Amino acid sequence: MPIDAKLLALAQRAAEAEGLDAALVCAVVEQESGWNPWAMRYEPAFFAKYVAPLYTNNKVGATEAYARGISWGLMQVMGQTAREKGASSLYLSTLCDPAVGLAVGCRILRQKLEAAGGDPARALLAWNGGANADYADEVLARVGRYR
């Protein structure tokens, strides 16, 4: 399936704005959403570990809590992570807006890369939560498609 040229250009610009390798960002997008800006996935284990305590302690309402337990958009940014990194829009579903989701996702990926000392494999493992040891290899194998 061909990639929408507008989405590709948006991804390249978002990567450039954060000083990231555009090919790496595009590979993450392909791995995470297959270039579907409307992709979303409820992550029950993430919800239970990171979000449920906020809801249980009345820090957030039910709708906000469940939205924080969903990965959204092209880069599949977790709602909770987006909130922690300053995404203050009223609705987390705005992460499905390609420009918004890519900007937030690239900012988070840059932070992960900095924390990993510039090592893309370690940054990708952190991006994915470390649960899938093959994730970084799968993404890095896709990078060449975007060079």
Language model features with spans:
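Catalytic glycan-binding domains that act on GlcNAc-containing polysaccharides
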Residues: 1-147
